[in-house]
Each structure stands twice: as C-alpha cells, then as structure tokens.
Amino acid sequence: MEDAILRRTWAEIDLDALEHNYKVARTRIGDGVKYLGVVKADAYGHGAIQVSRKLEQLGADYLAVASLDEARELRHGGITMPILILGHTPPEMVPQLISYHITQAVSAMAKAEEYSAEAQKCGGTLRVHIKVDTGMSRLGFLVRGEHFESGVNAIAAACALPGLDAEGIFTHFAVSDMDGAEYEAYTREQFGVCTDRKSVV
C-alpha cells in the first residue's frame, strides 16, 4: 500500500517562481556580474533540463553540474549555454569535455597537469575554472594565511599550462546559508580571500 501511495506523488515546479527568483538575484548582483545557475542533482529535484531551459531563456550566463553525465544530459536535452562541472572528471574524459564544450573545475595543480596533458594529446583546448579553498576545507587551491604565496603561484602556473583555457575562478562558501553576524563576517572574509587572490593572479 505504501508503494502505491509513493508512486502517486509528484513535485510541481512553478517556472514563474524561478523567473521571479532569477530576476531578484540578477538585480542584486548587478549587470557587470555573470549569473551561474547550479542545476546539479536534477536541479535539486526540480528537473535539470526544464530549469536549464528556463535559465537559458532568461539570459543566465552559465550552468553548473556535478558530473560529466549531468552535463551530457543537458547537451542531449538541447542546452547550448556554457556548463561548468563542479566535481571530478577522470582525465581520460577530456576529449569528451572538449567535444561537448564543457568547462571543468580544477582544484589542484596535479589535476591541472593531468587535464593539460590529455588536452594536448587530443589536440584541443579545455576550458577550466580554478577552485579556491577559502575555508570549506573540501577541495581547492589553498590560499589562506601561510599558503598565500604558494597557492597564488600554483594557480598562476595552472592557468599557464598548455591545452587549458582558464576562464574563471570560484570558491564554495562554508557557512553562507547560516544566520548570524559571526557567520556573515566569516562569509565576507571568504569572499575577500577569493577576490584578493583573483586580483593577484
């Protein structure tokens, strides 16, 4: 009986609400800032292709997904706008990344070198975004405190590798969705770390 009930449930997604939210966010970030919509995990259960089509129609600049499979699904669904893979992609998949016009996040020099080697091997150029660790302590080039100089140098070296086109830099805020002055101050500090390193590189 429980299975029958579960099969009859669904989520109804209001694309007008998505449009409203997009416009509010766009107003807050301003015209000079690019908008990237994260649609990983089937747009968090909202339907990745439908949400992506709406964001593309509204003028979003970029989409982000977790994996190559998710990126390919969007391409097969007719999505043509730039897509960034936030998660790891095995280096041997670089030819697919290039042929599908997918951008890959790079979180360490070793990964940048692997992607560079594979891109050169297939005679292409892989677009990448550099991930900076500003406090999440999950993935990314270390640039805080004593790691500043070595981190910035590593990012600059990764950006200069043949076969790679470093078109962006990003971070993952550790506590951006938590309330309170302490958390807000920490998020602002993380943002400052990322933008300071970007200006140096």
PLM feature spans:
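Active-site-proximal beta-alpha core segment in soluble small-molecule metabolic enzymes
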Residues: I5, T9-E12, A17-H20, V33-G192, ...
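Short, compositionally biased segments
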Residues: D196-K198
